[in-house]
Each structure stands twice: as structure tokens, then as C-alpha cells.
């Protein structure tokens, strides 16, 4: 919502698109998809809450505008693992699409939580083997970009803060070993 990615802008553009969908014989307008992806990895709970409050306000305005024009808006769906409690609290969302919680990626673990927030644990790991130890503080693994993604930063070695993955190619990863 308002992230300038997919879809149309909240407001009159969203209402116009909903009208076009409703007027098209093979299509059925089923509601709004409102995902605030940029809020998922904001580190502080207050930042995530503020971002979702703003997005929820926009979603409510569009939903209310549709209803004011006599259009049913049976579903407002969206949310994500990093913010789903905020969306649930908003009273706007009928459906939550949180999906990362089932495995939990490394980047979500850097989000700070409130005392009563749900804490999801990592449930999916990649097993890699050290192939070589070319220097005392560097090890080469048999897992690289074809085994893990780096779009949110390098993976972490589970429960080993002394090991840091610093480089990756298609088939190999490089670990730096601290003293």
C-alpha cells in the first residue's frame, strides 16, 4: 500500500480499477490486496506500527469509498510476518498472508519485538560442508548462491557468532573465522 510497486495508488485509481473489474463479465471483484512490504523489516516495533497504521488508513479509505459507491468489498487481505499483529489490530484486514513465519529467514530475526509479541524460531537450515581451509581465518564452503539467497544480506551460521559468511559465488561460500 503506497509502496509504488504493484497495483494502483490508493484512492480514486483503486476505486476506478475496482469498477472496471466489476464491469468485466469474466472477472469478479473480490476485495483489496493491501500488502505493506516495506514495513516488514523495519527494525523497531514503533516504526512497523506507524507504517501499518498509515497503510491501514489508506486501505480503509479505499474500502469505504467502494462501499459509498454501492460496491461490496468482501475482503481486505494482506499483512506479512513482520507486521501481521499490527494489521490484525487495525480492524481493516479480513485475511492475513503471513508466510515467512513457517521457516523464518535470518533478516526477520533482526527485527526487535515488543515483550508480548510472538517470537518465531528458525525452522529451515542449509547444511554446508567446509571444503577447504586456505588460511587460518578463512574457510570455503560447498554452498553458495544456488543454495541460499542474499537479497536481505548474507546468511548467518546458526549459533556461531564467531563465523561470518562474507562472500558467495554460485557454488561456494567463504567464511571468516574470528578469534
Segments from the language model and where they lie:
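Short, structured beta-strand/loop micro-motifs enriched in basic residues and often containing a Trp
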Residues: 165-178
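Active-site loop ensemble at the mouth of alpha/beta enzyme cores that anchors a bound cofactor
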Residues: 48-50, 83-161
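Gly/Ser/Thr-rich active-site loops/lids in small-molecule metabolic enzymes
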Residues: 53-58, 123, 163-167
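Active-site loop/helix belt of alpha/beta enzymes
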Residues: 2-114
